[in-house]
Amino acid sequence: MSTPPVPHSPAPSSFPLRPPAPPLDLPLIGHGYPALLRTPRARRWNPLASFGLVLAGLVGLLVLGGVLGALALIATSGPALLGAADPTDVTDLDLYSAPMVLLNNLLLAALIGVALLAVALGHPVAARFVHSVEGRVRWRWLARCVVVLTPLFLAYVLGAWALDGAPTAPRAQDWVWLLVMAFVLTPFQAAGEEYLFRGWLLLAVGTWIRRPVVAAAVTAVLSAATFSLAHGSLDPWILLDLAAFAVAAVLLTWRTGGLEAAVALHVVNNVVIIAVGTLVGTVEDSYVGAETAGSPAATLLSVAVVAVATALLLWQARRAGIARTVPVTVGARP
């Protein structure tokens, strides 16, 4: 009996194997938040495309808000509207009723979707990286920021209220609903503003500007201007207050590698102010509108508190070892 031939192993290839191509929608390893969208596939027109999407989203929300706002005003202030000598004069209408506050919160919360969609359609990087350099919301870090900030802002708001003479007024008829919305919906409203004015804006600017510090500085200026003017008041002290807040939020986003710290700062600030205002009957003073006026003392105190809060969060980020750049396990190699 003859033995079967021994199979020969194939000769080794003279061509080296190519490493697997990195996923096309990942940021580069080691990039900080401002540079997350700067990949080999990025193009100069990407920020313009996403800006067009943001603009379309804002126009859509304004139209929707105008229609729903008119219906809410008619429902809540119909007699005042019909009996007014000038139907376009809304000074006597209840702009701070539960339906109007609900509408405002939902429209601003929708900015989260606007920012994510603009990045998803306008840039070659997955939209989940708007949250952070890890491509996700770092919930434990977000909760830690809220816990750290809450005592500070309670002391600030209650102390400022006491120094102002502890003013009180009858609570609104729907104060319970206003209080519930302060805790349930206001966090999403605050997050919506951060995702647009800090998240999308910083990422879009960073696509054009290579140096992170320059990208953050340019974004801080743009964010301070747009964020301040978007609140409606042209009072210089209010504008300065809001601009300082915007700069702090940009700094936190850059130096912590994500939006969580800035969102926590905005959420705690808004929730504490609105909740206290609702309970003491001065909820209308909790919002910034066209008629809101500030003072040097109030602005100085507010800026000082935001500066302390920012320093606390940066310190906590170092202690917690929060990633500031894209980790090896998440990003693509250059």
What are these regions (language model features)?
Residues 1-123, 291-334:
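N-terminal, membrane-interfacial amphipathic/helix-forming hydrophobic leader that caps
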Residues 62, 116, 144-157, 241, ...:
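Hydrophobic alpha-helical transmembrane segments in multi-pass membrane proteins
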Residues 105, 127-192, 202-210:
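Juxtamembrane helix-loop-helix connectors linking adjacent transmembrane helices
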Residues 180-333:
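Transmembrane helix-loop-helix hairpins at the membrane interface
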Residues 114-129, 195, 200:
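Juxtamembrane interface elements at the cytosolic ends of transmembrane helices
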Residues 48-55, 101-102, 106, 142-147, ...:
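Hydrophobic alpha-helical transmembrane segments
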Residues 39-50, 92-101, 133-137, 141, ...:
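Membrane-helix interfacial "entry" motifs
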Residues 88-90, 129, 162-171, 285-293:
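Membrane-interface helix termini and inter-helical loops of multi-pass transporters
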